[in-house]
A protein has these predicted regions:
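Thiol-/selenol-based redox modules, centered on thioredoxin-like
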Residues: 132-176
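Short active-site neighborhood of thiol/selenol oxidoreductases, capturing the structured segment around
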Residues: 45-67
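Structural micro-motif
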Residues: 107-109, 127-137
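Short loop/turn microsegments at loop-to-beta-strand junctions
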Residues: 29-30, 52, 133-135
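N-terminal "domain-start" segment that seeds a small globular fold
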Residues: 19-45
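Bacterial N-terminal signal peptides that target proteins for export
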Residues: 1-8
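Bacterial N-terminal signal peptides
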Residues: 9-17
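Structural microenvironment flanking redox-active thiols in thiol-disulfide oxidoreductases
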Residues: 67-105, 116-121
């Protein structure tokens, strides 16, 4: 067998094995404990039976698409804040880098840091080159995956998230 055939066989095997572990609608979302740019540590468990959450995974801070997505969420976050949901952006960047990125883009929502890449791998967003793919995961109050968006338009991220949350039946936030 030639080296090209061996490589092709390995790649096919890898793609088949990866496709069998993809996070799907109805799956229990993997728990996580991640530090955020607001100084807090968040877990999936803390939202159980309380609130839906959205995690918008992005490849790397300070890159063009990620900056556009972050600005969309910062500028149009009111659309999401009107709904009974907590939303995050998440990457495998260091907490310090994410803090700088959040400050530069005036993000008024937490950015999660997963430098170990374990949570990104559990959420099946980690690409073969070690960075997350731009995927957004919607999780219900029960901790189950409601939707995985693998086709993100960075410039309309906030609007698209709000529309999807409404489509998924996430209610508006109750006045306190």
């Amino acid at each position: 067998m030639t080296s090209n055939n061996v490589l092709l066989t390995l790649l096919i095997g890898l793609s088949i094995s990866l496709s069998t572990i993809a996070l799907e609608v109805g799956d229990q979302a993997p728990d996580f404990t991640l530090e955020a740019t607001d100084g807090k540590t968040y877990t999936l468990e803390q939202f159980h039976n309380k609130q839906a959450i959205v995690i918008a995974w992005y490849p790397r801070a300070f890159t063009s698409g990620c900056t556009i997505e972050c600005k969309s969420l910062a500028n149009n976050g009111h659309l999401l804040k009107a709904l009974d949901v907590t939303y995050f952006m998440a990457s495998v960047d260091s907490l310090e880098k994410n803090k700088e990125f959040a400050a530069e883009n005036e993000a008024d929502f937490p950015l999660l840091s997963d430098p170990s890449k374990k949570v990104a791998a559990a959420y099946d967003v980690l690409a073969f080159y070690g960075m997350p793919m731009r995927h957004t995961v919607y999780i219900g109050k029960d901790g189950k995956v409601l939707f995985v968006d693998r086709n993100i338009q960075a410039s309309t991220s906030a609007e698209d998230m709000a529309a999807k949350l409404k489509e998924l039946g996430i209610p508006t936030r109750q006045a306190s």
